[in-house]
Structures are given as structure tokens and as C-alpha cells.
């Protein structure tokens, strides 16, 4: 075996006979898997190699190597299936468990990068530290069986149809990278830089994207449930045809984001910034959008049933077919908004602000509107709002005006009083 201290130990797969003796590579019979295992040639298991393992475990180690040898011998035309790969990997994990304390017992695989930066992860098991040599990166295994890419520069890398579950990309530079058809369950991207990255048809459930920089990135047809995106920078990101159930976007910066056909019940967007964003065909049922900045956003075909929107800002926002039934929208700000075919029935709109709004077929049936302030722009046509409710809203508003000034208000100074109420509510929100 080629051996240099503890830095490079390759396990041979075809060079041990059934009597545990060591044979020379020149006398080793070629197998159908030679093409696949050609990077193992000129390696031997000898006493020096076995000395890396506990003396009492030598027989076990040799037995495991023989089992792997038989698997390789049975491979047709040098090909290896994912199922066979997993079996072999299990043997090597078992081998590593017998390494003595002098060894660095991290099991790694070799990641080959071709000239187009496409990745092929081969089954090369050895005990080694992370190294970068020529165009090959030695990637150590994580404790959970994934790969440790942490803090590497992988700009423009293309990874397709790989199992990267439990891998670690923390602090990685992944600008313009592409992950397609990959299993990335429980993968860690904490603090990764990934502008213009593409995740296409990937499994990202239970992963960690906290504090990433993902400007202009794309999630397309992904499953990203129970994912942590808190404090993430995702402005101008595109998220479409994706599941985000129970994911956490606490204080995420998502200005100008484009969300299309997203299923995200129970999502947490508390204090997130989605200003100037476009949201269409979104299921935010039972979501938390409290204190979210949606100023100058466009919201169409949104399900916000039974959601929380405390102190949410929707000024100068266009809303069409937004369903907020049974939602709690206390202190929400709709100033200068345009609402069309929206439903607020049975919702809590206590102290909501609706100054200078445009309404078209908006439903406030059975809504709680105590303390609401509302002024509708004159000259608007097709205002289909229940007249009794509108009178009630205006009555509540005028009563609130009186409590702020100590006297009833005329129409001339109504707007000035409304602005004072707004300032008071803003102070309460802070």
C-alpha cells in the first residue's frame, strides 16, 4: 500500500485472497470491475496498513475487505449501482470504527470535477484530511454520513442526481451553482454565499439556510419543508412550484422576491421584508406574517385563512383575491392600497388603517373592526361593500377621532386626525 504517515491510506478491494495473504498487483486476476476501481491499483494491505487498526480487530477488518472484494468482483462491466454503492459504503464505515486512535477516521469520497464543472462522486474510501489537488477535491464524510464541503469555493459547480443528505456547505461560496434532482435532506448551508444559485427539483426538507446570501437565487419544484431561512438575504429570489410548509423566514430580507405557486401553510415570516415583491397563487394558511413589510407589493390569489398579520405593512399594495377569513389583522396598515375581490369576513381588524384605499367587491362580513380608520377615495366605481358595515366602520372611526381630540370632527379636518391616529398606532407598534 502506498502509505505516508497517516495522511493517505487506500483500502484495496481486489488484492487480498481468501487465505488472508497479500498478493502482488501483477498476479492479481482482473475483474469486471477493474475500470471502476482502477484508482486502487498499486495498493496493498500489508502489516503496516493493518497496524493502523487495533490488533484484535485485524480479522474483522480483513473479513470486511473480502466482502467488498466479492461485491466488486460481481459487478458487470465495471458499473456500480447506487444500491451496491450503499452496501460497500456500510462496510467501510464498519472498517473505520475499528481504526485506532492514531488515525483520522473520517471516511471520505472523491468528488471529480470535469472541465464543465459537473460533479461525479465516486466510491473512493480512505482516511484522510480535506485536500485539493489538481481538479480533484477530497470531501470528508460528516458524522451523519453526508459530505463536508464547508468553506470551499464551489462557484459554478453543477451537481445532478446525487444524494447529499446530511451534508455540510456552511460558509461555502456557491455563486451560480446548480443542484438538480438532488436529495439534500438535512443539509447545512449556514452563512453560505449563493447568489444566482439554482435548486431544481431538490429535496431540502429540514435543512439550514440561516444567514445565507441568496440574491437572485432560484428554488424551482423543490420540497423545502421545515427549513430555517432566518436572517437570510434573498432579495430578487425566484421561488416557484415549491413546498415551504412550516419553514422559518424570521427577519429574512426578500425585497422584490417572486413567489409563484407556493404551498406554505404554517410558514413563519415574522419581521421579513417582502417589499416590492410579487406573490401569486400562494397558500399561506395558518401563516405568521406579523410585522412583515409588504409595502408596494403585488398579492394575487393568496390564501391567508386563519393567519396572523399583526402590524403588517401593506401600504401602496395591490391585493386581488386575497382571502383573509378568520385572520387576526390587528393594527395592519392598508394605507393607499388597492383591494379587489378580497375577503376579510370573520377577521379581526382592530385599529387597522385603511386611509385613502380603493375597494372593489371587498367582503367585511362579521369582521371585528373596533378602532378601524377608513377613508375611501372619492370617484371610485364598483365599490361592492356591505353598506351597513361601511357605516359602522365610519362610525367607529369618527368615535376614535373624538377620543383623540376631545371633540367631534368635521369632514374638513378628518384626514388630519386620521394621520394623528396613524402616528399613535405606529408608536405603539414600535
Swiss-Prot record:
<dbReference type="InterPro" id="IPR001646">
    <property type="entry name" value="5peptide_repeat"/>
</dbReference>
<dbReference type="Pfam" id="PF00805">
    <property type="entry name" value="Pentapeptide"/>
</dbReference>
<protein>
    <recommendedName>
        <fullName>Uncharacterized protein YjcF</fullName>
    </recommendedName>
</protein>
<dbReference type="InterPro" id="IPR051082">
    <property type="entry name" value="Pentapeptide-BTB/POZ_domain"/>
</dbReference>
Amino acid at each position: 500500500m502506498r502509505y505516508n504517515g497517516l495522511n493517505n491510506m487506500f483500502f484495496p478491494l481486489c488484492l487480498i485472497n481468501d487465505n488472508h495473504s497479500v498478493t502482488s498487483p501483477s498476479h492479481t486476476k482482473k475483474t469486471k470491475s477493474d475500470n471502476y476501481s482502477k484508482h486502487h491499483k498499486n495498493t496493498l494491505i500489508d502489516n503496516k496498513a493493518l497496524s493502523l487498526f487495533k490488533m484484535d480487530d485485524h480479522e474483522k477488518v480483513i473479513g470486511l475487505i473480502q466482502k467488498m472484494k466479492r461485491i466488486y468482483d460481481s459487478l458487470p462491466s465495471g458499473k456500480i449501482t447506487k444500491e451496491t454503492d450503499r452496501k460497500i459504503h456500510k462496510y467501510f464505515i464498519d472498517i473505520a470504527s475499528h481504526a485506532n486512535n492514531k488515525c483520522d477516521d473520517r471516511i471520505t469520497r472523491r468528488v471529480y470535477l470535469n472541465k464543465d464543472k459537473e460533479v461525479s462522486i465516486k466510491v473512493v474510501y480512505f482516511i484522510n484530511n480535506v485536500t485539493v489537488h489538481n481538479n480533484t477535491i477530497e470531501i470528508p464524510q460528516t458524522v451523519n454520513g453526508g459530505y463536508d464541503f464547508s468553506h470551499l469555493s464551489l462557484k459554478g459547480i453543477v451537481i445532478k442526481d446525487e444524494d447529499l443528505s446530511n451534508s455540510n456547505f456552511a460558509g461555502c461560496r456557491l455563486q451560480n451553482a446548480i443542484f438538480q434532482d438532488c436529495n439534500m435532506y438535512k443539509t447545512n448551508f449556514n452563512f453560505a454565499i449563493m447568489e444566482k444559485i439554482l435548486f431544481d427539483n431538490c429535496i431540502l426538507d429540514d435543512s439550514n439556510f440561516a444567514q445565507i446570501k441568496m440574491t437572485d437565487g432560484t428554488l424551482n419544484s423543490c420540497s423545502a419543508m421545515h427549513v430555517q431561512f432566518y436572517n437570510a438575504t434573498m432579495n430578487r429570489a425566484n421561488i416557484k412550484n415549491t413546498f415551504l410548509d412550516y419553514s422559518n423566514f424570521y427577519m429574512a430580507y426578500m425585497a422584490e422576491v417572486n413567489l409563484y405557486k407556493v404551498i406554505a401553510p404554517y410558514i413563519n415570516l415574522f419581521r421579513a421584508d417582502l417589499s416590492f415583491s410579487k406573490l401569486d397563487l400562494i397558500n399561506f394558511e395558518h401563516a405568521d406574517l406579523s410585522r412583515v413589510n409588504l409595502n408596494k407589493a403585488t398579492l394575487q390569489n393568496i390564501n391567508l385563512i386563519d393567519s396572523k398579520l399583526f402590524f403588517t405593512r401593506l401600504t401602496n399594495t395591490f391585493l386581488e383575491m386575497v382571502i383573509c377569513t378568520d385572520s387576526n389583522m390587528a393594527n395592519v396598515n392598508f394605507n393607499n392600497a388597492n383591494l379587489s375581490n378580497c375577503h376579510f369576513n370573520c377577521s379581526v381588524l382592530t385599529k387597522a388603517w385603511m386611509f385613502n384605499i380603493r375597494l372593489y367587491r371587498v367582503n367585511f362580513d362579521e369582521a371585528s373592526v373596533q378602532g378601524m380608520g377608513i377613508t375611501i377615495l372619492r370617484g371610485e366605481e364598483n365599490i361592492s361593500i356591505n353598506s351597513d358595515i361601511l357605516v359602522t366602520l365610519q362610525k367607529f372611526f369618527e368615535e376614535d377621532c373624538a377620543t383623540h381630540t376631545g371633540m367631534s370632527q368635521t369632514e374638513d379636518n378628518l384626514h388630519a386626525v386620521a394621520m394623528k391616529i396613524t402616528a399613535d398606532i405606529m408608536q405603539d407598534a414600535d
